[in-house]
Amino acid sequence: VNWLSMLGGGVGIHVDIRSADDKSVGVMPHLKIYDAACLAYRQGRTRRGSYAAFLDVDHPDIIQFLEMRKPTGDQNLRTLNLHHGVNISDKFMRLIEKSMVNADADDSWELRDPHSHRVVEVVSARDIWQRILELRMQTGEPYIVFIDAANRALPSWLSDKGLKIHGSNLCTEIFLPTSEKRTAVCCLSSLNLEYFDHWNTNEQFIPDVMEFLDNVLQYFIDNAPNSVERARYSALRERSIGIGALGFHAYLQSKRIPIESVLAKSINYRMFSHIKEECARGDEILCEKRGPCPDAKDAGIP
């Protein structure tokens, strides 16, 4: 993890450590180590390290985990330098939906040890959901990851290999599979929407951005040290890149358009429809130049 940060990556960690018992101290003491590592290791040469931890909503340590960024309480259980997200399952949300319709509905939620699968405690799903919403209002976190929905959207040529999504990245922008052989890697960039009118008519702009990101990914594959071999293997097999956006509010301000107006909504739709279409076209151009990624090629996808 520290090596990935030193190489310039923001890091997401799925914490599947078993709950506290006579052999394990649970999740929080280990997260304190990552919390300290944020200060001890830089992200490349630009800024301090930054990590995000993800925990399943049925983990026995979920309550302590949810509250780890609160400024008050036991400092041994606080990790203020570490970001965090909770993996919410369909089963959990069905309980919440049922409880919203019927206040007397049974919302019993089993917390299970991730290794033995033994039920450690039964709690109220409503109480956990309420805690999540309150903490998001107070601290802005935890991130919410609908993990079952993410896995349903995983391309079949990855899921057929037995690969599964266990969490997200530093800022919950992407969902890539991880395994004992793979540490997910994605090369990201953002388009500045403040200057949308300058580049949206340039047919080469987004394809060039995509080729640039793929070049950066290739540089990582060619130069990554052996200590991050799983990350290099994942990058080689999947060649994942991602394009986001920033500056939408600045664009609206420059046009004196209210952000909650119908016009702003229409502009937002037009911008992101354009980006989606151009990314699809850029993907085809990149594939014609360099061929499909190995995972897709193995699945017979041209």
Task: Please name every model-derived segment.
Residues 13-17, 48-52, 77-85, 104-115, ...:
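Short coil/turn segments at secondary-structure boundaries
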